[in-house]
UniProtKB/Swiss-Prot annotation:
Function as written in the Swiss-Prot or TrEMBL entry: Catalyzes the reversible interconversion of serine and glycine with tetrahydrofolate (THF) serving as the one-carbon carrier. This reaction serves as the major source of one-carbon groups required for the biosynthesis of purines, thymidylate, methionine, and other important biomolecules. Also exhibits THF-independent aldolase activity toward beta-hydroxyamino acids, producing glycine and aldehydes, via a retro-aldol mechanism.
Protein name: Serine hydroxymethyltransferase
SUPFAM superfamilies to which the protein is assigned, alphabetical: PLP-dependent transferases
Span of the signal peptide: none
Gene Ontology annotations of biological process type: glycine biosynthetic process from serine; tetrahydrofolate interconversion
Gene3D superfamilies: Aspartate Aminotransferase, domain 1, Type I PLP-dependent aspartate aminotransferase-like (Major domain)
Cofactor entry: pyridoxal 5'-phosphate
Keywords: Amino-acid biosynthesis, Cytoplasm, One-carbon metabolism, Pyridoxal phosphate, Transferase
Designated gene of the protein: glyA
Length: 423
């Protein structure tokens, strides 16, 4: 029996919601920068009998019996992660990027220690010291931002803040920063103030794996990431380290420090994704992600819409909508009405609240997986510009939606193979 047919019989309500979500993904242009489309193989691993197995501990050091096969799977995931990022140690158990970060904090910090990360409104992340997050409640968080003129990192200012505040941990890596990160400069500052250096590469992990962005491991004490986004795996976390002995501290902070049993079905899916990312085709994919982002940015700029920092080096294109006198909240609603999913986002020195914002964040990873090339992304850019520059024109709204649906038909999600894979 088809798996989804079985679900439809046992729980038709959930089955209908899943089918509705599948239809939404097929008929919308996914431009949320933190999303991607995992392969059918990754999803099959997630939906396997491994979901039944409890396996507290590390491979060969479990607290439960019957772990011989999940040990093999987890060891393979670790080996592939180490090879992919040229690391000497890896822990594949974190359930998310946020939990990977929490495990690092538990290993390196005491409550009240000073941590230093990018201001959330400039492109940082909640887990880098935001006052609404554990990282900002348990630790003394100080923040750096970007240069007001260039919207790029200002290392002179970062050094000044570090010298003044003497953080125990400096965090680099961001959720809305479209430029290359100079990890070596961060290392120099960390050494000067005696701080640990952590890189959170959740957004750029796939580009790092493809050697299209500098690898932080030669410079950072520890690296965390998610396994979805540009890495195109299941939703999960990963911790990497260049020093195997140092890495053992993080093993203990994952389990029993912050988690119980690992999700072995997700770890299997991570192993599959790491294996996919080790193939030459993945480098081609990552190259296309960047090419597409540059075309998307240049198309929008040509229509009079400002892009934060004037362009992009990765998959992120961050629109500064002050250039067209619009808020991110309104822009999000406008593109959503024509089947484009994105997210409102603060821009550096944003006068609006986080619930309104002056920015719209776009990303090219998901549609590149779907097969979109530069020509297609030029079309996407024109559609977005048409919609944002004509917010009250119902005719243009209808035309934009028709163009979106035509693109979805030209680049079908999973090329129609999804149904066949789950029989």
């Amino acid at each position: 029996m088809n798996i989804l047919q079985n679900l439809k019989k046992s729980d038709p309500v959930i089955s209908n919601f899943i089918n509705s979500e599948k239809n939404r993904q097929e008929t919308h242009l996914e431009l949320i920068a933190s999303e991607n489309f995992a392969s059918i193989a990754v999803m099959q691993a997630q939906g396997s009998v491994l979901t039944n197995k409890y396996a507290e501990g590390l491979p060969q050091k479990r607290y439960y019996g019957g772990c011989e096969f999940v040990d093999e799977i987890e060891e393979l995931a670790i080996q592939r992660a180490k090879k992919l990022f040229n690391a000497n140690w890896a822990n594949v158990q974190p359930h998310s990027g946020a939990q990977a970060n929490a495990a690092v904090f538990l290993s390196l910090l005491q409550p009240g220690d000073t941590i230093m990360g990018m201001d959330l409104s400039h492109g940082g992340h909640l887990t880098h010291g935001s006052p609404v997050n554990m990282s900002g409640k348990w630790f003394n968080a100080v923040h750096y931002g970007v240069n007001k003129e260039t919207s790029e990192l200002n290392f002179d200012e970062i050094r000044e803040i570090a010298l003044e505040t003497k953080p125990k941990l400096i965090i680099c890596g961001y959720s809305a920063y479209p430029r290359t990160i100079d990890f070596e400069s961060f290392r120099n500052i960390a050494d000067e103030v005696g701080a640990f250096l952590m890189a959170d590469i959740a957004h750029i992990a796939g580009l790092v794996a493809s050697k299209l962005h500098p690898n932080p491991l030669p410079y950072c004490d520890v690296v965390t990431t998610t396994t979805h986004k540009t890495l195109r795996g299941p939703r999960g976390g990963l911790i990497l380290c260049k020093d195997g002995e140092f890495g053992k501290k993080f093993d203990k902070s994952v389990f029993p420090g912050t988690q119980g049993g690992p999700l072995e079905h997700i770890i299997a899916a991570k192993a599959v994704a790491f294996g996919e990312a080790l193939q030459p085709d993945f480098v081609n994919y990552s190259q296309q992600v960047i090419k597409n982002a540059k075309v998307l940015a240049s198309t929008l700029i040509s229509r009079g819409i400002d892009i934060v920092s004037g362009g992009t080096d990765n998959h992120i294109v961050l629109l500064d909508l002050r250039s067209i006198n619009m808020t991110g909240k309104i822009a999000d609603l406008l593109v959503s009405a024509v089947n484009i999913t994105a997210n409102k986002n603060t821009v550096p020195f944003d006068p609006e609240s986080p619930f309104v914002t002056s920015g719209l964040r776009l990303g090219t990873a998901a549609l590149t997986t779907r097969g979109f090339n530069e020509t297609a992304f030029a079309e996407v850019g024109e559609i977005i510009a048409d919609r944002l520059l004509n917010p009250n024109d119902s005719v243009i709204e209808s035309q934009c939606k028709d163009k979106v649906l035509a693109l979805c038909n030209r680049f079908p999600l999973y090329e129609g193979k999804l149904e066949a894979s789950i029989k």
